[in-house]
């Protein structure tokens, strides 16, 4: 457990933050530049903890070490990413850093290995000393807590691990974060804590303080119109692991073929993966689409390989990504995060945004970052494009999301 305050010049009793983004291609310089920029913004205040999001073109462990050396802070968590961002914009092949000086807080870092083969044990490792931290916070009258979780996004057990985290922390624990991603052509995602980085793992930062962190989510995806040949609601009639074999008793991929035809798209090997990713599945709860799932590939029998399991009998539809709607949704998520600060001033913002949204928006993704920035002007921000978004807070019980913008506001 670490106290939020640290020795150094001019301690203040409110949270302050600084961010940095480096587009330098050389790993031995990118982390240094991003950390130097973030440290400069703190104006001499010592960071309590921080976040490092790096393209897999950079060595994540090396980036963590560079940030630690420059900032003097080793309480860092990080992830590889499909794109990096700060309040200055969006980049690929970059390193993004957020350093937070939080004197009125206590926090704890944890690392959990073997996510694929032992997700329950991974979650237990991430929360092993959570109750001890909670007891310390209670003794100081600090009731609010948030867990930032980063997981290997190429593991198919992320959602199950998160459900175990819910059991290992406390009822209605607020949990945010994202699943580490990769650039096209790379196949190993990593998460990191302090000076180590590993695939097939998870990391956590648990923070307790006197003020609630604000969280907001939205996706802006739209269901098909009644005029289209794809049903507004389809039933998952056969599921094998995380593969949807059948929708309404037919090979699941047939629904996407009909959807593509409605949009004058001819699906082939060269575009099917992108079409699946940018037109994800919406999952209904009663008559409301409550979650989104991405199918990343198709099996030889027409099954859809998803990022997480769905229960047989689930009702789903195929959603469409209109760029304007995506950008507006990010703005709404930011507004919700600001509202959920309950009147507190924001010190920093984290943005966990899906890689599929980056793919759908392309060069326009800067506009999504700007939509968040418009709600939080002059507030340091960092984030990354994920392979799955994590947000469980008041009003939202399901922690795992796809194709969604998650905005997290850290209060002063």
Regions from the PLM with identified roles:
Residues 2-49, 53-70, 74-75, 79-348, ...:
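Small-residue-enriched flexible segments
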């Amino acid at each position: 457990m670490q106290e939020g305050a640290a020795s150094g010049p001019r301690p203040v009793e409110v949270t302050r933050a600084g961010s940095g983004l480096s587009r330098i291609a050389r790993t031995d310089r990118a982390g240094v530049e991003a950390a130097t920029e973030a440290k400069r913004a703190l104006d001499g205040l010592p960071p309590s903890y921080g976040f490092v999001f790096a393209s897999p073109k950079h060595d994540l462990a090396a980036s963590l070490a560079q940030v630690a050396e420059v900032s003097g802070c080793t309480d860092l968590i990080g992830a590889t990413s499909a794109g990096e961002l700060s309040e200055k914009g969006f980049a690929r092949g970059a390193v993004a850093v957020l350093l937070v000086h939080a004197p009125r807080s206590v926090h704890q870092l944890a690392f959990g290995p073997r996510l694929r083969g032992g997700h329950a044990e991974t979650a237990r490792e991430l929360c092993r000393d959570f109750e001890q931290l909670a007891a310390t916070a209670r003794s100081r009258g600090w009731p609010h807590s948030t867990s930032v979780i980063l997981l290997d996004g190429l593991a198919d057990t992320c959602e199950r691990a998160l459900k175990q985290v819910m059991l290992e922390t406390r009822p209605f624990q607020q949990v945010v974060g994202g699943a580490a991603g990769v650039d096209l052509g790379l196949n190993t995602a990593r998460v990191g804590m302090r000076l180590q980085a590993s695939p097939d793992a998870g990391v956590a930062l648990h923070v307790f303080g006197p003020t609630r962190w604000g969280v907001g989510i939205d996706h802006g995806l739209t269901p098909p119109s009644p005029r289209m040949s794809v049903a507004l609601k389809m039933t998952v009639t056969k599921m094998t692991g995380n593969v949807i074999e059948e929708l309404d008793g037919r090979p699941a991929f047939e629904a996407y073929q009909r959807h593509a035809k409605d949009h004058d798209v001819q699906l082939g090997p060269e575009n099917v993966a992108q079409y699946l990713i940018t037109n994800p599945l919406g999952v209904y709860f009663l008559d409301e689409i409550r979650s989104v799932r991405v199918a990343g590939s198709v099996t030889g029998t027409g099954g859809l390989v998803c990022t997480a399991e769905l229960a047989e009998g689930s009702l789903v539809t195929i959603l469409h990504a209109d760029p304007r709607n995506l950008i507006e949704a990010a703005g709404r998520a930011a507004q919700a995060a600001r509202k959920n600060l309950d009147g507190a001033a924001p010190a920093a913002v984290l943005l966990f945004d899906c890689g599929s949204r980056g793919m759908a928006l392309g060069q326009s993704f800067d506009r999504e970052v700007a939509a968040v920035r418009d709600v939080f002007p002059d507030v340091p921000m960092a984030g990354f494009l994920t392979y799955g978004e994590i947000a469980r807070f008041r009003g939202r019980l399901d922690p795992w999301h796809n194709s969604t913008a998650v905005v997290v506001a850290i209060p002063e």
